Amino acid sequence: MNKKSCLGCHQLNDEGGRIGPSLNRSSFNYKPEWLYAWISNPQNFRPNTKMPNLGLKPEEARAITSFLVSFQPEEENEEFEAPEGWKQYLSSGGDAKRGEKIFHDPEGIANCSKCHLVNGRGGTVGPDLSFAGTSRTRKFLLESILNPSVVITHGYQTVMILTKNRKFITGIKKNEDESGIDIVDKDGGNLHIPREKIKKFKIQKISTMPGNFKDLLEIQDVTDVLAYLGSLTLPAITNSDN
């Protein structure tokens, strides 16, 4: 990890950078085959990603993947496990077709596609879920539905800005430079707040995604949405040939 300067951008325990996502929960958040494929060549999946192609040999990518999958943060006393109450959501496979309807129904309670993009369809306030089934574990996807503030996907943190004329502006922070801060508001609109108009701003620890879907949706609804998300895959990613 140190040799390839991973810690320059990524956090492990309390060490490392904050440019990229924390890797403390890699085994819970990501599928091993996705970690291997992403580490090997991230531009294959996101051409505009800031993560460079490290030029890793297959055995190096495998070694880093194995390390991340087995890594346990020092402050954690137990391995990441699904809470007992999650079993009711994870005990069956669910109906992906029904889950797709729930996800994309603009009149439904969930209306997930208002904020999330799937294969060019939906909003951009939240993360693109077009290949969620390839990259994310089922447990992580469930956690993101039931308690979205536990892990806020890197690049989708909410920022609250107080302007010098005492106006509060909230949105997803997309960029910050000398000219100001670019955000996406709750309706998907792009806003640029000039630096000279900003008094102060703070990154919020609460996700913009509602945290009460456990109360709003039936267990079967959540299970079916999970099945739909799990079906959103890229062509098979394997490391069997490496």
What positions do the PLM features span?
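Flexible gly/pro/ser-rich segments immediately N-terminal to CXXCH heme-c attachment motifs
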Residues: 1-2, 23-30, 51-58, 103-107, ...
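Periplasmic/extracellular electron-transfer cofactor-ligation site
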Residues: 2-22, 44-45, 70-77, 101-128, ...
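Gly/Gly-Pro-rich "capping" loops immediately C-terminal to redox-active cysteine motifs
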Residues: 8-40, 50-53, 119-146, 157-203
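Post-cleavage N-terminal segment of exported redox proteins
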Residues: 12, 33-96, 100-101, 105, ...
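Residue-level signal for cytosolic alpha-helical hairpin/rod architecture
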Residues: 16, 20, 48, 83-84, ...
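Short glycine-rich, low-complexity segments
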Residues: 141-161, 165, 218-219, 223-233, ...
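Intrinsically disordered, low-complexity linker and terminal regions at domain boundaries
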Residues: 200-224
